[in-house]
Amino acid sequence: MSPAKKPTKPIFNRIRLLRTERGLSRAQLAEIIGVNVQTVGALERSDHYPSLDLAMNLSEAFQLPIEAIFSRTEFTPMSTQIYQEK
């Protein structure tokens, strides 16, 4: 399961944030989603974008909907979102 080529429109992600929140290493996440460690690094850096299958595996691993992990627009910092909710 290799990442897909980059489309012309960027896809932003929260993979690194979600992985570290859960105390997972890149190697642990790679094992859970069935890819190699380098793929996780490339996804976190947005060097590559995931296939639909890989995006669904990440969604299952983090127990979040895909749109909570990936977006066509930049995510606002979590601290900003939390502050605005109060």
Residue ranges and their predicted role:
Residues 18, 32-33, 43, 72:
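Residues in the recognition helix of alpha-helical DNA-binding motifs
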Residues 2-9:
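Short, Lys/Arg-enriched anionic-surface-contact patches
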Residues 9, 20-21, 48-49:
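Short amphipathic helical patch at the helix-1/turn junction of helix-turn-helix
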Residues 34-49:
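Recognition helix of helix-turn-helix/homeodomain-like DNA-binding domains
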